[in-house]
């Protein structure tokens, strides 16, 4: 699935994200809520206004989970098992939403990193986010 070159590029992208995890994670959530308003239904108790403490906090959690996945590229299923259980059994999030958030995270990366986000990095990170979304959806079967 992920080649050695993909893994190298994914780590390089994540190094560029360092220090901006909360910002990028919350911006990706905001973009998802705007582009796909149906996703708001999973956050009825959140203040969904831009920059709210709850969106920033959840954005930080999203970025932390992605950071954990980057550290565990060879074993994503194990690294994301608890998160998969939470979303499948407790929160019952429709797995299509993982792909929507992944797409929004890609937009955030491209917007913030600009030329530092090469087409090769984009392709590798897209494969990574697709793998993360697939792992998070595993428990639904």
Swiss-Prot record:
Which GO CC terms are listed, alphabetically?
A: blood microparticle; haptoglobin-hemoglobin complex; hemoglobin complex
Q: Does the keyword Thylakoid apply?
A: no
Q: Which molecular function term from Gene Ontology is one that the record holds?
A: iron ion binding
Q: Which InterPro entries match?
A: Globin, Globin-like_sf, Globin/Proto, Hemoglobin_a-typ, Hemoglobin_oxygen_transport, Hemoglobin_zeta
Q: In which tissues is it expressed?
A: Red blood cells.
Query: Gene3D superfamilies, from UniProt?
Result: Globins (1.10.490.10)
Name under which the protein is recorded: Hemoglobin subunit alpha-D
List keywords of the entry alphabetically.
Heme, Iron, Metal-binding, Oxygen transport, Transport
Family the UniProt entry places it in? Belongs to the globin family.
- List all membrane-crossing ranges: none
Every Globin domain range: 1-141
